[in-house]
Amino acid sequence: KYRALVLKNNRNTEILFTIYLNQDCKISDLKNMIKNNLFFAAKLYPLHATTNSSSGVKDIKKMSKYFEFLEKNKIPLCLHGEHIHKDDDPYERERRFLEYELSWLVKNFKSLKITLEHITTKDSVDFVKSNNNIAASITTHHLLENTNTFLGDYLKPELFCKPIIKSKKHQKSLLSAALSGNSKFFFGSDSAPHLKNYKFTESCCAGVYSTKYSISNILELFYSSKKTNNLNKFLTINGCKHYNLKFDNKLISYVRQKDFKFQKYSKFKNDSLINYNHFKNHWIKN
């Protein structure tokens, strides 16, 4: 029903559907879905790693039959890369995931196409560079924010997300990877719309709603860094190549507007969504 609803409201966009992979999935169902071309990739969340992951996987190493199935059928595996344990520091979860889960995964399933989504650390950048069957997506907010902007003078709940925003050292590594044009890194917004009442509250939801200004922020980042020659690689080419997708050669031009008045909130039902934006300048389609 959800797939039908999305397609009904689609406007000339190729929608790549993913399944929520966990230990309750049946291989027979996956076979039938592949036969009917119902999904493109599988997404795996560790249990309780982030918002809406209460049906996630407790022990990845017990999922071998699913990884074998994905590998055999050339289905990409997309990962939220955090090791979840009650004693783990939230700032160490991504590094520990590389050590305990991902190292095992790439070693035992060498032909499985893996995407480590929304990476946040230098450790992940180095890991992706050193392994052949894996690439990574990077979000706008993890490129542009760090612990100083998130937790510095004031706590900004609108920047609270999972994996949590890291230090300048890690931010610098993410920026270097994105701006370099390296084919193993590409844009992934991980945009998560949560109502204002659920963000500015005692126990706020994890997620940054970046959709409205993501492309503008990425354009300004590459422009101000004098790396526009690598912009298309990060935004379109690298991701398409990783997933073996054709990309449209049509060019879109943008114009830079200085001191643009940004819309902080977007009304939604009886509440509003908090739009993420970093720069004062804005890029609009020409």
Please describe what each predicted stretch is.
Residues 1-34:
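A metal-dependent hydrolase metal-coordination microenvironment
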Residues 1-6, 101-102, 217-219:
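Short, well-ordered amphipathic alpha-helices
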Residues 9-14, 104-113, 224:
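Short, surface-exposed connector motifs at secondary-structure boundaries
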Residues 15, 42, 114, 190, ...:
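Conserved, mostly hydrophobic/aromatic
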Residues 21, 119-120, 234:
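Short beta->alpha linker loops
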Residues 25, 29-44, 52-187:
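Histidine/acidic residue-rich metal-binding segments in metalloenzymes
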Residues 107, 180-246:
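His/Asp/Glu-enriched, well-ordered alpha-helical/loop segment
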Residues 215-286:
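Mid-to-C-terminal alpha-helical segments outside catalytic/metal-binding sites
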